[in-house]
A protein has these predicted regions:
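Active-site loop-to-helix "anion-binding N-cap" substructures in soluble metabolic enzymes
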Residues: 1-255
């Protein structure tokens, strides 16, 4: 049975000191969570603090990006070996902000996904359409292109270590949210596409999160949908009390 996972994406927020304070507040709030996975995606500068503060807890740590290469003359970049050395377990790849601001395409993202898997890191592959694409009725085409491109040469066996996150770009940080029915419709399409690519057994076991203005008020209704297996949470993951509510909604749905 696939796992419900609630992941936070801090983006370019929180110093190491602020991260330590956050985890000291979050840990007691979610200590009794047994069924849902908990992940925090932290900026590179806070990763060492994050892995140290969560050691021995039920919280796992993700990087928000990485370079596909192990080392070399890539000024300003961080490699999978560096992330592993810090105790990071997951890495968020293909986020719409990386696609838009840093011009990452499916080919670049695919190289990162394959590199993460080769270095025993679990990629959280983000996919999703822009508002004009939804209005043009091309949501499924966009999502299919991103999944097929992002997972090129990824084997069925490796899919056990891949998480997908559907984030409609028009709902990220805008306060707009896909309705539970809208989100479920796309998640069901994604599940069907994974079935076509890898077979039903693999598809049924892949965690597909919803992202896009998920918060403590709407999380339970979204996660209750058949094919929504948790969330990738932005702004609400910066506040321990709000994030804990979302985590507990995921935990309740996972029982």
């Amino acid at each position: 049975m696939r796992k419900v996972i609630v992941a936070g994406n801090w983006k370019m927020n929180k110093t190491a000191k602020e991260a330590a304070k956050f985890f000291n507040e979050l840990k007691p709030l979610v200590a009794d969570v047994k069924n849902a996975g908990i992940i925090i995606g932290a900026p590179f500068t806070a990763l060492e603090t994050a892995t140290r503060e969560t050691a021995g807890s039920n919280i796992k740590i993700a990087a928000e990006n990485m370079n596909a290469k192990e080392s070399g003359a890539y000024t300003g970049e961080v490699s999978p070996l560096m992330l592993k050395d810090l105790g990071v377990e997951y890495v968020i790849l293909g986020h719409s902000e990386r696609r838009e601001y840093y011009h990452e395409n499916d080919e670049i993202i695919n190289e990162k996904v394959k590199s993460a898997l080769a270095h025993d890191l679990k990629p959280i592959l983000c996919i999703g359409e822009k508002l004009e694409q939804r209005e043009a009725g091309t949501t499924n085409d966009v999502v299919k292109t991103q999944i097929v491109g992002g997972l090129k040469d990824v084997t069925a066996e490796q899919m056990a270590n891949v998480v997908l996150a559907y984030e409609p770009v028009w709902a990220i940080g805008t306060g707009k949210t896909a309705t539970p029915a809208q989100a479920q419709e796309v998640h069901a399409f994604i599940r069907g596409l994974l079935t076509d690519l890898y077979g039903k057994e693999v598809a049924e076991n892949v965690t597909v999160q919803y992202g896009g203005s998920m918060n403590d008020g709407n999380a339970a209704d979204l996660i209750a949908q058949t094919d929504i297996d948790g969330g990738l949470v932005g702004g609400a993951s910066l506040i321990p009390q709000k994030f804990a509510v979302i985590i507990k909604a995921g935990d309740a749905a996972a029982k």
